Amino acid sequence: MQNIDLICVGKLNAPYFAAGVAEYQKRLGAFCNFRIIELPEAAIADKSASDAQISKALDKEATAILSSLRKGEYLAALCVEGKQFSSEELAKLIADRANSGAGDIAFVIGSSHGLADSVKKSRQRKSCPMGRITMPHQLARLVLTEQIYRACTINNGMKYHK
């Protein structure tokens, strides 16, 4: 069974987001070994942090993210620089990885400051924006978990996706 990881920087505090994520996580168990890895957000002293302070925090988060990856795991980073994709294209990405014999894939959601370049360039084959809108990272986690579930139902010929 394929391993799919969702690596997230920051906690999921809102109970309504947590309930939604838990529901899709449970459903995903029928299709893959799905795990969520929650990493702490690096502390930044004040709201008016310098670019250097933010960069240092992102580097600290990057170290934790990269050490969380399985050996040979394909990394898909959620960041604005990437090409947008449809649910069907996400399903194809997941299926292609599963069929390649090296099926492990990790989706990464960074902190509110984004992701360090070292994460974007390390083993990454995809940058996956969630559209051109801005949303809270907790909501992004729920939306991405649902989209991974949707992709799995597409790949298994189920009628969830219309």
For the regions a protein language model found, what residue spans apply to each?
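Structured adenosyl-cofactor binding patch, chiefly the S-adenosyl-L-methionine
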Residues: 117-162
